[in-house]
Amino acid sequence: MTLADLVPGDTAKLEKIDTHDPGVIKLMILGMVEDITVSMENIAIGGDPLEVGFFGSSVSLRKEQARHFKVSRI
């Protein structure tokens, strides 16, 4: 399951990150690293972008980027 598969209200643990996308590296610099808990806050009309919360903050990312984050639902 990937971050892109979550729906608003879901909470998950980041298990593995595919770092082949430069945009994913930027998100990791912001704190989206393995073993943290994230929550799907909102999905825009049309399904893109996604708003993801972690460490008391939220970031928006494209669904294509979210597919690089493997998660397990909590």
PLM regions and their residue ranges:
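Short, acidic/hydrophobic/Gly-rich beta-strand patch recurrent on exposed beta strands
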Residues: 15, 31, 51-54
